[in-house]
């Protein structure tokens, strides 16, 4: 079982915690991580692209000139695809790009992402994270005590408005709850900061 040091909010060591081997101690599967990231990024696409077909562009109800005798190429509508201002053939239409991987693959991807942070020594476990009022400077002080200078993902057991509001204005810092842990967020941030309660909740969900 991987062991990780537990810190308090001031950055002092207060003990150790054993992380679940089946979650934090597995060998990260890069192929599964790739598929999970692609799935999440695909679901983020708006898919609102749209072009007009020949039936939707303005004009073109009348045949521009008679079929024979003009010397020009025969035309049936000024809104055919070959005309300037004509409709587009097989152009993009609104669609959803979202798709889902099998549940077992998604769970393996989350485990692999968490295990990656353990392997890289980029996981920090806090005894607890309590802020009496939403203050950015208090959150900055916590991160400074933990010597976190890069992008950080803070995971709490439950929704905590004071923590969320305190971190909202800090560039590169994101706060999520334990049941919202996902591959893209974990890999996108350099440091993973979890409270002990959040670790226990994640282990309970992924066990």
UniProtKB/Swiss-Prot annotation:
Q: Which Pfam families match?
A: Ribosomal_L4
Q: Which UniProt keywords apply?
A: Ribonucleoprotein, Ribosomal protein, RNA-binding, rRNA-binding
Gene Ontology MF: a single term: structural constituent of ribosome
User: Entry's Gene3D superfamilies?
Assistant: 3.40.1370.10
Task: Return the InterPro entries for the record.
Answer: Ribosomal_uL4, Ribosomal_uL4-like, Ribosomal_uL4_dom_sf
Segments passing through the bilayer:
none
Task: Give the GO biological process terms.
Answer: translation
Any one GO CC term of this protein is: ribosome
Q: Which SUPFAM superfamilies match?
A: Ribosomal protein L4 (SSF52166)
Q: Where is this region: Disordered?
A: 45-89
Q: Compositional bias (Basic residues) at which positions?
A: 60-71
Q: Which family does it belong to?
A: Belongs to the universal ribosomal protein uL4 family.
Q: So what does this one do? A: One of the primary rRNA binding proteins, this protein initially binds near the 5'-end of the 23S rRNA. It is important during the early stages of 50S assembly. It makes multiple contacts with different domains of the 23S rRNA in the assembled 50S subunit and ribosome. Forms part of the polypeptide exit tunnel.
Assembly and interaction partners? Part of the 50S ribosomal subunit.
What is this protein identified as?
Answer: Large ribosomal subunit protein uL4
The gene from which this protein is expressed is rplD
């Amino acid at each position: 079982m991987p062991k990780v040091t537990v810190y308090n909010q001031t950055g002092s060591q207060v003990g150790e915690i054993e992380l679940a081997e089946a979650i934090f101690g597995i060998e990260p599967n890069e192929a599964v991580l790739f598929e999970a990231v692609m799935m999440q990024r695909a679901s983020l696409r708006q898919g609102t692209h749209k072009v007009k077909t020949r039936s939707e562009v303005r004009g073109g109800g009348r045949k521009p000139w008679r079929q024979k005798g003009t010397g020009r190429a025969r035309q049936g509508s000024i809104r055919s695809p070959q005309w300037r201002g004509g409709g587009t053939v097989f152009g993009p239409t609104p669609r959803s790009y979202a798709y889902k991987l099998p549940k077992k693959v998604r769970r393996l991807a989350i485990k692999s992402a968490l295990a990656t942070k353990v392997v890289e020594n980029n996981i920090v476990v806090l005894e607890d994270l309590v802020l009496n009022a939403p203050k950015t400077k208090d959150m900055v002080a916590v991160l400074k005590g933990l010597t976190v200078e890069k992008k950080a993902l803070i995971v709490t057991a439950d929704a905590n408005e004071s923590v969320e509001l305190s971190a909202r204005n800090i560039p590169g810092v994101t706060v999520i709850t334990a049941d919202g842990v996902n591959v893209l967020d974990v890999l996108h941030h350099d440091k993973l900061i979890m409270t002990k309660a959040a670790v226990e909740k994640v282990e309970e969900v992924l066990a």
